[in-house]
Amino acid sequence: MSGFFITATDTEVGKTVVAGAIAGVFRELGYNVGVYKPLQSGHVASNPEGDAARLKSLSGVPTQENEICPYSIEEPLAPRLAMKRAGRVVKLKEITDYYNGLLKEFNSLFVEGAGGLAVPYTEDALVIDFAKELQLPLIVVARPTLGTVNHTVLTIAYAKAHGLTVAGVILSGCKECEMERVQENKEMIEELSGVPVLGLLPFFAGEFTKEEVLESAKEHIMISKLEEFIQNESNVAGAPSM
């Protein structure tokens, strides 16, 4: 199995933008990368405002939104609760089997969870249980401001306690006027967790284009460090890029 599992310290911290942007950059580099978000609540997969649509747009993958996200619910709740209220049951094996099916099309997959690692996910699993099934290195997306050191260090400790590898942290939504504090938070996270902060992604105000996001990712995220993980797993694109 190859790729990354993108998780976060909380919801609405920029996880989807980070996942889509990194996938898009890797595809530009020639890697046969796909994106996968098994469960989505808050929007159905086809909604252009939803995460699946944003992942498709930023990454440039050929798969459709309902293939990127096979299980989606309109109600904005934790996925397990949203599915339960809608009378639907999704099990861990289903989303893991779907992942394995996507690997027939892509050499690597960037998988986005929902919220943080302890979120109730499928009927029988938390997000972290899914991450453990895949055994992909984690990218933790976090806020850059007050409270992020505690949340990020706890997330990393929880992941490590469950035997997961954390590739790095990306602080998302960094504003120029706050950069001194952001830099201090970055250094503290690295010191306390032993995990590198691989990027300080700027805050995107209003509407933004794919090109703007990908260029920002190239400038502000250490793509080469992430590339080492893919190469070490012998997953440089051997199939044609799509």
Swiss-Prot record:
Keyword list (alphabetical) reads: ATP-binding, Biotin biosynthesis, Cytoplasm, Ligase, Magnesium, Metal-binding, Nucleotide-binding
Q: Name one GO molecular function term.
A: ATP binding
Does Cytoplasm count among this protein's keywords? yes
Q: What pathway, per the record?
A: Cofactor biosynthesis; biotin biosynthesis; biotin from 7,8-diaminononanoate: step 1/2
Question: EC number(s) per UniProt?
Answer: 6.3.3.3
Q: Which Pfam families match?
A: AAA_26 (PF13500)
Q: Provide the GO biological process annotations.
A: biotin biosynthetic process
Q: Mind telling me which InterPro entries this protein's record contains?
A: DTB_synth_BioD, P-loop_NTPase
| Catalytic residues (positions) | K37
* Keyword Secreted on entry: no
Q: Where in the cell is it found?
A: Cytoplasm
Q: Which residues bind Mg(2+)?
A: T16, D51, E112
User: Which cofactor names does the annotation list?
Assistant: Mg(2+)
Family annotation (CDD domains): DTBS
Question: How would you classify this enzyme at the top EC level?
Answer: ligase
Which residues does the record give as substrate binding sites?
S41
Q: Which domain of life is it from?
A: Bacteria
One GO cellular component, as annotated: cytosol
- Name the positions where ATP binds: E12, V13, G14, K15, T16, V17, D51, E112, G113, A114, G115
Chief localization:
cytoplasm
Q: Provide the reaction this enzyme catalyses.
A: (7R,8S)-7,8-diammoniononanoate + CO2 + ATP = (4R,5S)-dethiobiotin + ADP + phosphate + 3 H(+)
What is known about its subunit structure?
A: Homodimer.
- Family under the similarity heading: Belongs to the dethiobiotin synthetase family.
Task performed by this protein? Catalyzes a mechanistically unusual reaction, the ATP-dependent insertion of CO2 between the N7 and N8 nitrogen atoms of 7,8-diaminopelargonic acid (DAPA, also called 7,8-diammoniononanoate) to form a ureido ring.
Q: What is this protein called?
A: ATP-dependent dethiobiotin synthetase BioD
